[in-house]
Structures are given as C-alpha cells and as structure tokens.
Amino acid sequence: MVKVGIVGGTGYTGVELLRLLAQHPQAEVVVITSRSEAGMPVADMYPNLRGHYDGLAFSVPDVKTLGACDVVFFATPHGVAHALAGELLAAGTKVIDLSADFRLQDPVEWAKWYGQPHGAPQLLEDAVYGLPEVNREQIRNARLIAVPGCYPTATQLGFLPLLEAGIADNTRLIADCKSGVSGAGRGLNIGSLYSEANESFKAYAVKGHRHLPEITQGLRRAAGGDIGLTFVPHLVPMIRGIHSTLYATVADRSVDLQALFEKRYADEPFVDVMPAGSHPETRSVRGANVCRIAVHRPQGGDLVVVLSVIDNLVKGASGQAVQNMNILFGLDERAGLSHAGMMP
C-alpha cells in the first residue's frame, strides 16, 4: 500500500485527489494539510467523502510527518512546493507537484511569468514533466514530477501526432481553448462568480497566459525545434472542462490523419481518438481521466483542425497526478482511474 500525503487539501485539485484516491486499491491517504483548517475532519469539510476519510483531519504541514509518506502531492499555489520539496526529497519521499513550480526548465522564464524568483532552481534537473504519453519511462524513475497544467495537457496531446510526424507548419500553430470556471480555483474571484460568468463567454489573457511557455516548451520538444504558437484562452459558463480547438497547416493532403492519430495513441489508456467526423464534448469526459480527440481536415484543404477535450480537474490535474503515481510505483496505470465520464 502506497502511503500518501497531500499538501493543500482544501482547493479543487486537493479534494479531487481525495475523491480519486478514496477508490484506489493500492494507495492510502495518511496525511493531509491545511494551515487554515488544521484540526477539521476531512469529512466535515467535504460531506461527499463521508465514509471514506472519517478518521482523517487536516493538519499543519510538518516535514517529518510528510517525510514518512511514500509520496507527497502538492495541490498548492505556486511557490509552496519550492519551500518544501527539497527536504522531502532528502528524506527519500517522492514528490508529485500539481502547481507550476517545476514545469518550466528555465528558472528565469518561470520568474517572468509568475512574478517572483524561482525558489528551488537546484531541483529543476530532477524534475520530470509528468505527461505520461510523452515521458512515461522518465516518470518510472523520477523523484520529482511536475504535473502538466490543464490547457497544456489538452493542447499538447492534440498537436503531438502532427509535430512528431513532422508534417505541420510549426510556425503557425493556433490553440483556441475554452475552460470552465473551476480552472480559476476555489478562492474568491469576481470573474468566477455565478452572476459574472453565467450566460457569458469571454477571452482573457490574450497578450499572454502563464500556460503559454509551458505549452511552447512541450511543443518544441515534439517538433525538435522552434515553433510559433498563438494561444487564446476563454472562460465559458460551465464548472468543469477544457475544449481546445487546434489549427495547423499540413501541406501534404495525402496523409491519413485519422490513421496517424490512431497509431500514435493506440497504446495509451487515457487518450481516446474518436472516429472520423466526430465532435467530442466536454461532458463526455466530466469526472474521467481521459483526453478525447477528433481530427478534421475541412473541405479537404491544408488546414487541419484538432478537437481535444479533458476534465480540467482530472486529466488536467488530479487524475493525471494519480496516473503519474501509478507509473512511479509500478502499479497498474489505470488503478483508481477507471471512472467513465458523467452524463448528463
């Protein structure tokens, strides 16, 4: 049984970790921390978890207690894992970070986008980017895993087959992405209020979003060189979900794109390439650790449109974190993650 600690258990990704791990056959949450809610039973804060964590209460983060775990998840704002990860790694504890603290390999670039100096640049060499569909073998031997963001997960998985095959114009990629309001987190945010977000639809951060350098970093690796990406995120009035509409130019019209995508993801348990002509919906992945993809070539032209949907809290965060844990400890990659999407 893998002994699990969670730092930051009161946000959406933290409670989603609890929900998924409650049904995991080979993992047990033994520590969960929250400075603001220390002493409160988990089941009191989250009644949906009654009967699963009745003996577990939030506690103040303590390195000695966390260091006794096999793995610690950080479901915290950026900067928190910088302060604690080094001590936990020194204690022999594996670290899986759901924040952005170790996603970017360049600490200067990280500081530019997150508005503060990188707090643990010495750990970046140890950090493995936790996109299993790309880095599965590195994840197996990792000490520190950086779980990808939600937009980067949907966007990279959609573009990867085209870039790896070298058939796209890498200088003119477009990612037109939509997210539900849970992507903004559980804290007070005027733009996420029901009366502000409901019956409305808007773009934001067009000048530059924090996920842009992460997406660019991953696509460069896939392409083996520089890429040009325009990334425009939007907020839509739903709770969960990411829908990425991706555009790339592919001059060779003889390429069987459906076959290309099906072959690339044939052995991936959490990527579903839908039949030709499909239009995946966010509701089909709600609550599931699945990225559902469809590829189109409208009017048989040279513009390719890829549709990629995920649940931002599952495959875009906590589910992918558990998937990484399964790989890291040699477990069945599907363990605790077999849930179908919730419909309606």
Curated annotation (Swiss-Prot):
<keyword id="KW-0963">Cytoplasm</keyword>
<dbReference type="InterPro" id="IPR000706">
    <property type="entry name" value="AGPR_type-1"/>
</dbReference>
<dbReference type="GO" id="GO:0006526">
    <property type="term" value="P:L-arginine biosynthetic process"/>
</dbReference>
<comment type="similarity">
    <text>Belongs to the NAGSA dehydrogenase family. Type 1 subfamily.</text>
</comment>
<dbReference type="InterPro" id="IPR023013">
    <property type="entry name" value="AGPR_AS"/>
</dbReference>
<keyword id="KW-0521">NADP</keyword>
<keyword id="KW-0028">Amino-acid biosynthesis</keyword>
<dbReference type="Pfam" id="PF22698">
    <property type="entry name" value="Semialdhyde_dhC_1"/>
</dbReference>
<dbReference type="GO" id="GO:0003942">
    <property type="term" value="F:N-acetyl-gamma-glutamyl-phosphate reductase activity"/>
</dbReference>
<comment type="function">
    <text>Catalyzes the NADPH-dependent reduction of N-acetyl-5-glutamyl phosphate to yield N-acetyl-L-glutamate 5-semialdehyde.</text>
</comment>
<protein>
    <recommendedName>
        <fullName>N-acetyl-gamma-glutamyl-phosphate reductase</fullName>
        <ecNumber>1.2.1.38</ecNumber>
    </recommendedName>
</protein>
<dbReference type="InterPro" id="IPR050085">
    <property type="entry name" value="NAGSA_dehydrogenase"/>
</dbReference>
<dbReference type="InterPro" id="IPR000534">
    <property type="entry name" value="Semialdehyde_DH_NAD-bd"/>
</dbReference>
<dbReference type="GO" id="GO:0051287">
    <property type="term" value="F:NAD binding"/>
</dbReference>
<feature type="active site">
    <location>
        <position position="150"/>
    </location>
</feature>
<keyword id="KW-0055">Arginine biosynthesis</keyword>
<dbReference type="GO" id="GO:0005737">
    <property type="term" value="C:cytoplasm"/>
</dbReference>
<dbReference type="InterPro" id="IPR036291">
    <property type="entry name" value="NAD(P)-bd_dom_sf"/>
</dbReference>
<comment type="pathway">
    <text>Amino-acid biosynthesis; L-arginine biosynthesis; N(2)-acetyl-L-ornithine from L-glutamate: step 3/4.</text>
</comment>
<keyword id="KW-0560">Oxidoreductase</keyword>
<dbReference type="GO" id="GO:0070401">
    <property type="term" value="F:NADP+ binding"/>
</dbReference>
<dbReference type="Pfam" id="PF01118">
    <property type="entry name" value="Semialdhyde_dh"/>
</dbReference>
